[in-house]
Amino acid sequence: MYEWHWHIEWQTPYEFHGHAITKVIAEEKTPYQRALLVELARFGKALILDGKIQSTITDEFIYHEALVHPLLLSINNPEKILILGGGEGATLREVLKHKTIKNVTMVDIDPVVIDFAKKYLQEWHQGAFDNPKSKLVIEDGYKFIKETKEKFDAVVIDLTDPIKDSPSQMLYTKEFYEEVKRISKWGIVTQATSPSFSLETFSIIYNTIKHVFKKVSAGITYVPAFDGLWGFVYASDEVNPAEFSKEEINNRIKERIDGSLRFYDGETHITMFSIPKHIREVLEKENKISTRENPVAVPA
């Protein structure tokens, strides 16, 4: 008999991915979500929120490098960045690798997740919370965006999936992206769920952002712990990361990144934006828009 328990993550109402849990490190029900920190048999230490794996020690670098670097390397000398979500601190870690960064504000709604990260996820944040360039704000992201008078060079949106009636759901709407655009000089990037398990959700997020920004591109990559492709949407009125060549990206990494990258380089950049035809066709044909009245949601 196997001496472990199982974490069952539902991808759709009729499909799940099972992970063997060898150890429960910490667990807490917060006012916003159920937070669980575990050791998985295959992927090691992992953060799970509301039944969804957020990242694991084995492959978190794939997701976080893909989220951050295509946008920040495409803009000129980013200095002031806003992160929404990103409780593990790994998104903050990647932003701080850019030599031109002067300050980063990270806004997360749940202090329990931040405490989890500071105490247990040192491999993720690598001291980023204590960097003098970092500022942590515990607040609802939508509220912060509407009330702030600050302007940022770019906004990195690293939220949980738009689960129905969750705190994150309204942060995938046209109204929200319009508010984010108001405070962003160069543009935004958001995680956009999985084209493998929720292609309609991915395409609606993409189409919604297309109705707010002039230049919008979708990127994808495979994340093993998620058991499928993961999608990102990059948006700006000024630049399009998808238009940069392999050589341009490699040169910018050499000039502008302080520290090593394990996943992302010029060749990976080209691969991320080389989206299969069937997914491109869905993106091109999508006509639904996520609004506060009718917000998009993942199927499970």
From Swiss-Prot:
S-methyl-5'-thioadenosine binds at residues 33, 108, 140-141, 167. Gene3D superfamilies: Spermidine synthase, tetramerisation domain (2.30.140.10), Vaccinia Virus protein VP39 (3.40.50.150). It catalyses: S-adenosyl 3-(methylsulfanyl)propylamine + putrescine = S-methyl-5'-thioadenosine + spermidine + H(+). CDD domains: AdoMet_MTases (cd02440). Pfam families: Spermine_synt_N, Spermine_synth. Spermidine binds at residues 64, 88. Its main location: cytoplasm. Catalyzes the irreversible transfer of a propylamine group from the amino donor S-adenosylmethioninamine (decarboxy-AdoMet) to putrescine (1,4-diaminobutane) to yield spermidine. Belongs to the spermidine/spermine synthase family. NCBIfam families: PRK00811.1 (NF002010). Homodimer or homotetramer. This is Polyamine aminopropyltransferase. It comes from Sulfurisphaera tokodaii (strain DSM 16993 / JCM 10545 / NBRC 100140 / 7) (Sulfolobus tokodaii). The gene is speE.
